[in-house]
Structure formats: structure tokens, C-alpha cells
Amino acid sequence: MAVKLNKNRMQLSRLLMLGIVFIGLFCRTMFGEKEALHETLELFGYILVCLCAFGRVYSSAFIGGKKNTALITWGPYSLCRNPLYFFSFLGIVGIAALTTSVTAIAIAAVAVWFLYDQLISREEVFLKEKFGAAFDEFVRTTPRFFPSFRRYTCPDEVTLQPKYL
């Protein structure tokens, strides 16, 4: 089941990115290239893409090699249950922001939210079956998607497996 979910997730994510590129090619910005809002949207896009890259590497450091075999509830996984999806969401919205088209940003945000909500729901069924009461407690105490920095916990040492970064 986990392999099927992963394959499907990757296919859907690629289709979504192609759609965003297509939208970016055909959506016109309402702002001139030197206008403040144009520059602000571009800067916002670059910041989100950088946060995506950092956040995905950071999250992968904690889950790498343990996905579907252990329930990781510390590090970025203590902030929200799906940090990889959250940081990918930031990256995709950031790429859309680089088009400086408000339409592209809105479409990207809604499309990614819809896609990830569906994927997360399917993955949660698998995790509930695999980890039972421990996953129920994780659901009860940890936000699903948007991070809450009040609960951050991290062990003193984390073993990294570089091939998963």
C-alpha cells in the first residue's frame, strides 16, 4: 500500500507542477516589472522556495530511512504531522509567486491544498492501521498541516542517513 501511495503521490505532484508552469506561462501579471508589488511578489516567491528547500531537507533528516517503519513525532514532526507536504506547499506557492500573477498564486495554493488534503487523508488511513493508538495520540496533539511552534521537541541526537537527504 505504501509503495502505491508514494507512486501516485509523485505522479500527481508532477502533474500539478506542469499545470502551474502552464498557468505561469499564460497568466499575465497586473504589475509592471519595476513596480513595488511585482518586486515584493518575486521576493516572496524566492523566500518561499528557499524555505521549501531548507524545510524539506530538515524534515527528511528526521524521517529518512524510517518512513512507514517508525512513527516520528519529534523535530519538524512535532510542529505538524506533514512537514514535507507543508514545505512543498510553500515551494509550489513560491514558484507561482515568481510569476507575479495573483491568479497563478491563488490557483496553485488551492490546487496544492486540495491535492495534499486528499493524499494526507489516504496516508492517515495507512498510518492508523500501522501505528494504532500511537498515531491516534499524534493526531490528537499535533496539527495536521500548518505548524505550531509551541510543541517543538527534539532529541539531543539524531542519526542521519545522507542518502535520504
Predicted features, each with a name:
Residues 80-81, 86, 90:
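Conserved SAM-binding loop
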Residues 72-82:
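Short, amphipathic, aromatic/basic-enriched membrane-interface segments that mark the entry/exit
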